[in-house]
């Protein structure tokens, strides 16, 4: 039996509630981990088993209906991901997927009506369990609703990829499952109602009372819930367009997005059993893959450390950056060029070994800018300015007046040391030399330089435009001014910066 020793168990507590107008009582299941809103409800193995027991208890009471709600401000914010890194073999991952499916399906297959009273944030498996219920009320005070799993290298693995598109259609499902996570967006209650995720909205002050009354009206046949008609003729076209967008933006760098897209396509014609079986297999693949493990690591850093970074020097020590140099002109370097130019609004110059590579890198940036204009995300005046900020050369002397130079070359220590040996002779003594290395020693990289104190790790996660984490790595001789500058630049780039030593 799969267990998570770190799980903060969200218990499912059952009480029978008298509802005016009904002969039988309603069974109200409340999700509550016993802590305040700062530690939200989540589903780990023990939490799922608690919900399973609660559904059994509720069903045995022969209620008029079963309703699921959460503790104050929080419905449920998803799976307890603290246990994911502890899964060591695929069989455990499959077991976790099947457990969630089995428990949630009991709400979908219930002989009595089931309702989700979404009183607060409902994310990930929190929204998935609500989708298994026959009806959903949502508080106008709910902070967020969504399926953000793709952003952390996973998929909606407990029915979301199959239920949502068949509830609101392929366009809305693609937005919630793919587009929103990759742009760090969620649904607000009004939008959830407009899309058909929520059947009705109520104000927070009397949310539970109004939800119970509304549910009674549904049970008695006094209230009819109309659902949007699903246009299956446009399903394939919507997903074809979504795949094009993913390929253009991510270049295959996010396997979870491709898995989610495949599951959305399957949801058009597959039975629910076949669809959820495919979900389990996809979830297991991703849990055991490098992408989800790296993404979960990054997510943990952002949640625990980026919000309260420790060891960051006084920001007054940071030097002003008026020009950025990038060594390399490949895909990563080109993504960095676009990010620096867009956020810092300073000249950015790329270099590489030959002009063809340089030209390709600059063309990539210009092409991305053109796409933003065509999609209405940028006006032509801003685009023209941005294009003018990015240039390239095979001559590294263009770095002479750069305040911040970052390398994105081959992941080899000798290669990177050679790069810095060349660059150090060109730039000013206090220019920051940043490395995007993911695994090499910053200290070793700087060891032979005249000014090792201005070398710092500046590690982005790919794709650069999507993932918020930025690891700033302090070498043994990195000084406070360099470190402060790195954090200041990271903040301007709108990244969540964490200090790594």
Model-derived features: where do they sit?
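Conserved CoA-thioester-binding segment of acyl-CoA-metabolizing enzymes
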Residues: 1-69, 105
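Rossmann-fold NAD(P)-binding glycine/threonine-rich loop
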Residues: 417-488
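Hydrophobic, secondary-structure "cap" segments at the distal end of domains
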Residues: 161-174
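NAD(P)+-binding Rossmann beta1-loop-alpha1 motif at the extreme N-terminus of oxidoreductases
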Residues: 21, 307-368, 391, 475, ...
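Glycine-rich beta-to-alpha active-site loop
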Residues: 101, 106-152, 156, 328-331
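Amphipathic alpha-helical segments at domain termini/boundaries
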Residues: 1-30, 128, 173-282, 293, ...
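NAD(P)H/NAD(P)+-dependent Rossmann-fold oxidoreductase cores
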Residues: 82, 322, 351-432
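Glycine- (often His-adjacent) and acidic-residue-rich active-site loop
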Residues: 38, 69-103, 122, 151-154
């Amino acid at each position: 039996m799969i267990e998570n020793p770190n799980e903060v168990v969200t218990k499912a507590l059952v009480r029978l509630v008298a509802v005016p107008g009904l002969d039988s009582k309603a069974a109200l299941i409340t999700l509550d981990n016993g802590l305040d809103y700062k530690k939200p409800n989540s589903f780990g193995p023990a939490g799922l088993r608690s919900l399973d027991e609660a559904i059994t208890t509720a069903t045995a009471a022969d209620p008029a209906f079963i309703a699921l709600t959460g503790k104050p401000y929080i419905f449920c914010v998803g799976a307890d991901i603290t246990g994911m890194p502890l899964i060591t073999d695929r069989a455990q991952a499959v077991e976790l997927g099947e457990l969630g499916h089995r428990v949630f399906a009991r709400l979908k297959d219930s002989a009595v009506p089931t309702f989700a009273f979404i009183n607060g944030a409902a994310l990930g498996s929190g929204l998935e369990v609500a989708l298994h219920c026959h009806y959903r009320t949502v508080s106008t005070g709910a902070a967020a609703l969504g399926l953000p799993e793709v952003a952390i290298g996973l998929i909606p693995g407990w029915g979301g990829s199959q239920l949502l598109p068949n509830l609101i259609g392929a366009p809305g499902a693609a937005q919630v499952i793919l587009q929103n996570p990759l742009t760090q967006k969620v649904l607000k209650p009004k939008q959830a109602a407009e899309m058909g995720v929520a059947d009705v909205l109520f104000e927070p002050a009397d949310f539970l009372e109004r939800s119970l009354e509304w549910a009674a009206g549904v049970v008695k046949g006094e209230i009819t819930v109309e659902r949007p008609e699903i246009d299956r003729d446009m399903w394939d076209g919507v997903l074809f367009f979504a795949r094009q967008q993913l390929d253009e933006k991510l270049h295959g760098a996010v396997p979870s997005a491709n898995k989610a897209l495949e599951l959305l396509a399957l949801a058009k014609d597959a039975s629910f059993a076949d669809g959820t079986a495919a979900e389990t297999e996809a979830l297991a693949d991703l849990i055991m893959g490098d992408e989800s493990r790296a993404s979960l690591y990054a997510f943990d850093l952002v949640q625990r450390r980026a919000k309260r970074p420790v060891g960051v020097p006084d920001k007054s020590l940071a030097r002003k950056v008026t020009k950025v140099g990038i060594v390399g002109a490949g895909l990563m370097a080109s993504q960095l060029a676009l990010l620096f130019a867009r956020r810092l609004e300073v000249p950015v110059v790329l270099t590489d070994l030959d002009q063809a590579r340089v030209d390709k890198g600059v063309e990539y940036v210009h092409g991305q800018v053109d796409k933003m204009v065509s999609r209405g995300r940028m006006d032509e005046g801003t685009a023209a300015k941005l294009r003018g900020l990015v240039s390239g050369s095979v001559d590294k002397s263009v770095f002479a007046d750069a305040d911040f130079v970052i390398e994105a070359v081959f992941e080899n220590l000798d290669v990177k040391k050679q790069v810095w040996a060349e660059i150090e002779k060109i730039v000013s003594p206090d220019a920051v030399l940043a490395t995007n290395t993911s695994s090499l020693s910053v200290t070793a990289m700087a060891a032979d330089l005249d000014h090792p104190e201005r070398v710092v790790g500046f590690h982005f996660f790919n794709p650069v435009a999507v993932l918020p984490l930025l690891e700033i790595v302090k070498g043994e001789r990195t000084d406070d001014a360099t470190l402060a500058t790195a954090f200041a630049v990271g903040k301007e780039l709108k990244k969540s910066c964490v200090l790594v030593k």
